């Protein structure tokens, strides 16, 4: 009998399903089992292109949520910054990788992140999530390099130090 409870079973099942169906299955599995955590959502959704995210959403099948991954996430995740990040990814509003880089926009993002991360107070996570989740990988690399130049700190480490609960996500 085939089971998906073992790591091998999960890998075999994912390979059999194919790239987007397996991601939809993982996105569907996270809330059904206690042993699965937010990592499944992160691995299956975050950082994907809009096209890939749309394909994963199209492959999501769960009658309880009328085949809507957005409804599933809204109902199953607690109302916190992680849900905001996942919902932003599901909105398919991420910059495309082939979009030309805008130096002024990158400088503006670095300044906004600097305002959030370099002040002593907490807060600003929602704005930070909005920036990071919706930018392309190329944009994020340029932003991280400029952040290092301006603030002489690693952007990822600054985010972890500022918002430990977001860094886990």
Enumerate the predicted regions with their spans.
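Structural signature for extended repeat/solenoid scaffolds and their inter-repeat hinge/linker regions
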Residues: 1-169
